[in-house]
Amino acid sequence: MGKIIGVDLGTTNSCVAIIESNKPRVLENSEGDRTTPSVVAYTQDGEILVGQPAKRQSVTNPKNTLFAIKRLIGRRFQDQEVQRDVKIMPYKIISSNNGDAWLDIKGQKIAPPQISAEILKKMKKTAEDYLGENVTEAVITVPAYFNDAQRQATKDAGRIAGLEVKRIINEPTAAALAYGLDKEAHGNRIIAVYDLGGGTFDISIIEIDNVDGEKTFEVLATNGDTHLGGEDFDSLLINYLVEEFKKDQGIDLYNDPLAMQRLKESAEKSKIELSTSQQTDVNLPYITADSTGPKHMNLRVTRAKLESLVEDLVNRTLDPLKTALKDANLSVSSVNDVILVGGQTRMPLVQKKVSEFFNKEPRKDVNPDEAVAIGAAVQGGVLSGDVKDVLLLDVTPLSLGIETMGGVMTSLIAKNTTIPTKHSQVFSTAEDNQSAVTIHVLQGERKRASDNKSLGQFNLDGIAPAMRGIPQIEVTFDIDADGILHVSAKDKNSGREQKITIKASSGLNEEEIKKMVQEAEANAESDRKFEELVQIRNQADHLLHSTRKQLKEVGDRISLDDKNSIEQSLKELELVMKNENKGDIESKVQELIKVSGKLLEASSQKYKEKVNDSKSDLNKDKSETDASGDVVDAEFEEIKNKK
């Protein structure tokens, strides 16, 4: 059985880990980094860049450089949060045929799971390079407060990337696994995992029970906000910088995509610097220009100013903390340890607010960037049998139910119910002689059905005519370990049954997923061919350089015909290198190697002559030394220490 990799598919950064020799190990990517920016770029020549290479070129290619895509995954275009992003993102967010939020890249419609799949492919390749074998299975993390549609879309992304997603695991739960795996304390411990990442916020209250070496991780309650994170902190700082520049120069940078991309990079850097410094300078020469000439941005930002800008965002995280504790029937004093996860928790203001809320300092022995991937790898180890004596009991973050008469949501499974779980309830018809019922599946905490998230609907027909209230329709909700819902409806009288795995009325259908998988495979083949083309071009370039050097050094030692043949072959190779045909370049490389044989011989002969000359000089020097026979006494004297 191959390794099951653990992937933290983050909004800002992603990370991959494995279990090796019973210990989790975070893997370095091809750039040598342990985390990879969750950035994907589509270049003008059709190449897809992922991670740091994509981030580096974002300033010159803002419209085709995609970041924070996790905020769009599994969402509808008309969602309030998506509409907010439509206004501020440099890339184009559009509505798909079924109302999902998709991307328009150079006129091509692309689904968010396809973008996430590119990041997952990079994680997969990182693991394969380290292990030296194919990787086909993964545990992928999601925010605890992700709904069914977002979880399903994440699984779709894994599938498009060529991975069988063995388990979807909540990020705070994964962090708890990473924290609790090597802790030897016996008995029960209650931990709070505060996870503030690039785009999402979660709080989970988790009980770790250690009895005779067997550890149980039970999630007692979870809460959060799937559209609150570091990107929002960046946006507020960017807004401030734009307004200050407008006051100073009278120019609105919002109309300049290149300037905004530079500003975004600088704002992110400044925010990070202000976690360790009291002030920083935002210095962007030639940020824009008008009729009077180029304009430069040079603004000083203090930590106090940044904190005043983002304090409301930090305060927004406190209500979910209260709700989670209330749902778990616990007080603040019951919490033994507080763990901070996500890069944004490095901000001193965040740490201060969390510390004040829980009346204790958060632990510092958990790496906020790597803990989630490590926990995912641990869960992968549990599933493959590499990790023993660990039991994970996760929960569903939101209530699940159906719409009943009067537009009311009737819950079948309450939020914070341990999963996997199954629940049935009997309903009846609303009208006389009703021959079919529509099961409208909902997720959320509101009483009015329309105020909750619609996960989809299906019909159960063929119900025998009867007075209203007589037919018995048994509706069963079954949530699997990934938190994905399966629903069935059964007419108890006729035995007629209808079952579905809930796919949001949005989401990708099977045909779309298969097409995207095929495209991903085709891209992989295209990437391989591109890599081979680069390799042969590099080989050709090296051969051109070395042949020209030899021609300069020993060209006078070969015949004029041979010299002309080599020069002609050099020109032909140089010309063919401009094309995309690998076979043509290979052919001309071989041709140049063949015709430059005489040149190689001449070069080799010159080297031999040089070696022989050196030996001759050495022998001459030696014979002169032997002939003299004189020995020179060393003029040393002994110096005795004075006493």
Curated annotation (Swiss-Prot):
Record protein name field: Chaperone protein DnaK
Molecular-function GO terms, alphabetical: ATP binding; ATP-dependent protein folding chaperone; unfolded protein binding
CDD domains xref list: ASKHA_NBD_HSP70_DnaK-like
State the superkingdom.
Answer: Bacteria
Which stretches does UniProt call biased (Basic and acidic residues)?
606-625
Give the family per the record.
Belongs to the heat shock protein 70 family.
Q: Where is this region: Disordered?
A: 605-643
Query: Could you tell me what induces this protein?
Result: By stress conditions e.g. heat shock.
Please give the function described in this protein's UniProt entry.
Acts as a chaperone.
The protein's organism comes out as Blochmanniella floridana
Listed A to Z, the keywords are: ATP-binding, Chaperone, Nucleotide-binding, Phosphoprotein, Stress response
Read off the SUPFAM superfamilies from this record: Actin-like ATPase domain, Heat shock protein 70kD (HSP70), peptide-binding domain
PROSITE patterns given in the database record: HSP70_1, HSP70_2, HSP70_3
Q: Which residues carry this modification: Phosphothreonine?
A: T200
